[in-house]
Amino acid sequence: FRAITRFGTIGDVWEGISAALEVELSPIKLNVVVMRGVNDDEIVELGRLTWDRPLHVRFIELMPMGEYFSREKLVPAEEILVRLSSFGELEPAGSPAGCGPARTFAWKGAAGTVGVIGAVTQAFCAQCNRLRLTATGRLRPCLDDTAAVDLVPALRPVVDRGRLAELFQHAVAEKPEQHTMAQR
């Protein structure tokens, strides 16, 4: 756990998940970036968390960003689904709110769902409903692109709601039709 996250403990994380389940927060989504040779042996075990808990575990392909990416560590979405299917037949399931580009499935009788995001091997850009806000006030239309819309001028010295709405609309309009992750 620490090798992937660089801080914290799985015990603390599980304590938070348990607390969220106890007070019936919904949806509770767990994102798992799958890496061959690192955590790919835990796919089924993590998916099985949804059997008796109303969790939404989403498996995400490792994206070509940062120091940890290597093509050898990439586990394609279809391979993830094959591994999950070894526990039982998966059926397409309705997506909980905010699942964006995840393809969602469930085992018959399961309390939760599993999702797969083929960030590299499957073009999901047309279904992507995400914008990313940086700590410096820049709104990025695509995780794979450095283009960004600066929101700070619409926030300081006072908030200009009209201008802010225009900037958000501009960012949405700038979302690319296709990312370039597969080429890297």
Spell out what each predicted region is.
Residues 1-60:
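Radical SAM/AdoMet-radical enzyme domain recognition
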Residues 48-52, 62-184:
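Auxiliary Fe-S-binding modules of radical SAM enzymes
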